[in-house]
Amino acid sequence: MLLFLMLMTGFAGFVDSAAGGGGLISLPAYLFAGLPVHYTYGTNKFSAACGTTFATAQFFQKGAMNIRVGLLAAVGSFVGSALGSHIVLLLSDQVLRTMMLIILPVAAVLILWRRDLPDENRDDGTLNAKKAALALAIGLGIGLYDGIFGPGTGTFAIIAFTTLMGFDLRTANGNGKVLNLASNYASLFTYLMNGLVVFHIGIPCACLLYTSPSPRDGLLS
């Protein structure tokens, strides 16, 4: 079963870097393997945080982000995700499973819709109070979603940064990575403090994310 989870997590990482929505694969895989829902959330967040750390470093190295906007969004995202994760701890397994049945298809449709996003930079490079507040709000809202559910977070961030703030896809993707990094670690800390990470599963799955081939390189070239 561990081999199955490693393969599925690796595939989820590949899908996530190509089109977003890797959690649509990894979350059901953990549940199929028999992990209770809260342990599924915690273990999935562990491997996701490791993968996002690597991806964010790549985007930062290539300068494919607006660091000021990304950091502001990350602050909001950390707060929102921490709140969302604590909400998850209050919900029963049955409620969370029902949420998955409803949200998974919706997230999948929105990820497919992302293909029609404009790839045009309309940002003028300045950062005023309005833009700062918008970046914080984007981070807070998407972070809350990531803390409560998760799949599609990166895609929703790209949609927000392109449509609401006018960034091109490359920069929006980088901003989204910073946002998602903060939300992943906020959730991970919450689950770690509550003993909800299965390390003998999460560590091998996280290691596979580092070695999986990634189409991300084409975006950053």
Cite the ranges covered by each PLM segment.
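Small-residue-rich hydrophobic segments that form or flank transmembrane alpha-helices
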Residues: 2-81, 85, 136-143, 153-212
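Transmembrane helix exit motif
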Residues: 54-64, 101-127
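Interfacial loop-to-helix junctions that mark the boundaries of transmembrane helices
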Residues: 90-99
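Hydrophobic mid-bilayer segments of alpha-helices in multi-pass membrane transport proteins
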Residues: 100-102, 156-157
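Juxtamembrane cytosolic amphipathic helices that cap and anchor the N-termini
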Residues: 130-135
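Single conserved hydrophobic/aromatic residue that forms the stacking wall/gate
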Residues: 210-221
